């Protein structure tokens, strides 16, 4: 799942450290989210959107591939 976290954070002039503090996570978690190495839980995605005063849909970009289930 793609996201706009880094883009939005920079537009708002927020450092990774300050954003991490808003969310209650480490700066390393923010870095992992921004580079796509980590997908947040729905709860964390909600907190991210809330810290930006945006909706989840404005922050996260869902592709059709994100909705496909792996076959057993």
Can you describe what each PLM-predicted range is?
Residues 37-47:
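Short, basic-rich loop-to-helix N-cap that marks the start of a DNA-contacting helix
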Residues 45-49, 59-60:
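Hydrophobic micro-packing sites on short alpha-helices
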Residues 14-31:
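Short alpha-helical DNA-recognition segment
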Residues 1-11:
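A short, Lys/Arg-rich alpha-helix, primarily the initiator
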Residues 10, 21, 50:
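Alpha-helical residues within the helix-turn-helix
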Residues 60-72:
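Short, charged recognition helix plus adjacent turn
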């Amino acid at each position: 799942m793609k996201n706009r976290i880094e883009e939005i954070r920079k537009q708002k002039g927020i450092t990774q450290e300050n954003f991490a503090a808003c969310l209650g996570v480490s700066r390393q978690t923010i870095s992992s989210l921004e580079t796509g190495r980590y997908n947040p839980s729905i709860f964390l995605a909600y907190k991210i959107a809330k810290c930006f005063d945006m909706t989840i849909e404005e922050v996260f970009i869902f592709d059709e591939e994100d909705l496909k289930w792996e076959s057993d």
